[in-house]
């Protein structure tokens, strides 16, 4: 596998830390050892997160190609758009963000706090759009790029989650390399890796990265899209493309994509009682915050699997904390009593 042939612009501090979740592990019976790899602590750019890791492999093209405007898209509380706004500010570029109405949640402050607030503070041109949630290329995003061209700019397209970009999976191939280096220091290997999965490139890159040492099917994606067929197709397609790019040396097949569909509901962006319990439990036992859209759902999945005995006794499980906490402010009503 060869990742070094791709240019990378450093936006992160270095390898994100791996920390034990000792009290959570003990609370759940002590038979499974839980750890977290903290992508929520990976950068000083507006709280970082998994998209910052991905953007390291996209921005060299933007810089070398003379692009002057990063154009991206997400929901109103998109972590992706916040991270793109931060990178644009860091690079001295303009930024246009399309924020669609992906979440069926009504709150007077939803479009004024959290991620979208930070994007505005960082100077992004934020454009609200009423379109609902879906996975793939969006007309509103294409129009935003056309607007930049019409005004004399040169837009660099960054799709939702970086996932439709050919290099969208590379950052999480590197994630797997980091984990292997950290495993050498820890003196053991993780038996399972749990990750939230929606637009697909985080899960796909990780799958390819761990396929290099035979652990592709030990990467457990927790669907948070509530459109699992689309997410599964995205993960497979992106993983197959990424495997070819990095010369993995073997084909990625549908059997390599492990996607647990139990925890996404009632719909994208809306938590259920299990999600909220997982958020509170992890916060109160570990001081580690997760969000109702992504990490709360993957945390719910991991906790539930431990409780149900789905991990063999003695397993060491790595939870990929992808970020997302800035969105908590937009859901303050759900946590008014803690």
UniProtKB/Swiss-Prot annotation:
Reaction(s) catalysed by this chain's protein: 1-aminocyclopropane-1-carboxylate + H2O = 2-oxobutanoate + NH4(+)
Superkingdom of origin: Bacteria
CDD domains given in the database record: ACCD
Known EC number: 3.5.99.7
Modified residues (N6-(pyridoxal phosphate)lysine): 51
InterPro entries per UniProt: ACCD_DCysDesulf, ACP_carboxylate_deaminase, ACP_carboxylate_deaminase_bac, TrpB-like_PALP, TrpB-like_PALP_sf
Assigned keywords, A-Z: Hydrolase, Pyridoxal phosphate
GO biological process, one term: 1-aminocyclopropane-1-carboxylate metabolic process
Single GO MF descriptor: pyridoxal phosphate binding
Active-site residues (renumbered): 78 (nucleophile)
Top EC class for this record: hydrolase
Cofactor(s) the record lists: pyridoxal 5'-phosphate
Subunit structure, as described in the record: Homotrimer.
Sequence similarity: Belongs to the ACC deaminase/D-cysteine desulfhydrase family.
Function: Catalyzes a cyclopropane ring-opening reaction, the irreversible conversion of 1-aminocyclopropane-1-carboxylate (ACC) to ammonia and alpha-ketobutyrate. Allows growth on ACC as a nitrogen source.
HAMAP family reported for this sequence: ACC_deaminase (MF_00807)
Protein name in the entry: 1-aminocyclopropane-1-carboxylate deaminase
Organism: Pseudomonas syringae pv. tomato (strain ATCC BAA-871 / DC3000)
Lineage, opening ranks: Bacteria, Pseudomonadati, Pseudomonadota, Gammaproteobacteria, Pseudomonadales
Gene symbol of the encoding locus: acdS
